[in-house]
């Protein structure tokens, strides 16, 4: 997916780039696989903001994606590669031989007309989903389950891929895109290949308005606030933080502080992430 750069005809266009969408083969989504998507604007069920800087943006429908890949042994043909406004990856529309239609994440190299399948008997081919037990060492995989039958939850964004490094007992060792090395139950499903749309990271929005189209509102610096609103706030003119380490809006240490608190699964992490 090449990236198109604009000529600097205005301040907003000067550093702007967009995807060319050359891989998209179908504009209108499959209506049977759409669901309404209500805007939350970062609020929880009590109406309180739990995620800041969210709101507005273009109206969307949710595309129902098959993360479980549980149609075992039934081949499907790739009917189209589509755009999904809810994720960075492209999605592929599958037509199964029994008549059912489903969306999956479109891996790199998957084209219209290709055949994909799920299950232990599937070939080691891009787009096929198999248990980690059946996948050879060194293979790149994505859409990886953490619990058998719950559906893939890891390695789903554009250009992401994990590598199967080892198998020992009931666990497989994977190197994640972040550099983390962790163990996963060997019967969990994973899809062969790397997620497509590699050039997503090279797209530059260029102006604040494109952020607003995506539903992202402005982020105000703490130093620009009053002292009652942020630990960095206050002072006459531009003032230093006045503390040894930066703090969050709620007084917690910020920037480089570990935020992971799940000791139950620490035993599955062999090496911490590098970035």
Swiss-Prot record:
Record's Gene Ontology CC terms? large ribosomal subunit
Q: Which Pfam families match?
A: Ribosomal_L2, Ribosomal_L2_C
Molecular function (Gene Ontology), one example: rRNA binding
- Keyword annotations for this protein? Ribonucleoprotein, Ribosomal protein, RNA-binding, rRNA-binding
Q: Where is this region: Disordered?
A: 219-263
Please state the span of the N-terminal signal peptide per the UniProt entry. none
**One GO term (biological process):** cytoplasmic translation
Q: Work out whether the entry's keyword set contains Oxidoreductase.
A: no
User: Looking at the record's lineage, which domain of life comes first?
Assistant: Bacteria
Q: Which spans does this entry mark as compositional bias, Basic and acidic residues?
A: 227-239
Q: Where is the composition biased (Basic residues)?
A: 249-262
Family of this protein: Belongs to the universal ribosomal protein uL2 family.
Q: Which PANTHER family match?
A: LARGE RIBOSOMAL SUBUNIT PROTEIN UL2M, RIBOSOMAL PROTEIN L2
Q: What does this protein do?
A: One of the primary rRNA binding proteins. Required for association of the 30S and 50S subunits to form the 70S ribosome, for tRNA binding and peptide bond formation. It has been suggested to have peptidyltransferase activity; this is somewhat controversial. Makes several contacts with the 16S rRNA in the 70S ribosome.
| Assembly information from the UniProt record | Part of the 50S ribosomal subunit. Forms a bridge to the 30S subunit in the 70S ribosome.
- Name the UniProt record assigns to this protein: Large ribosomal subunit protein uL2
Q: Which organism is it from?
A: Roseiflexus castenholzii (strain DSM 13941 / HLO8)
Gene it is expressed from? rplB
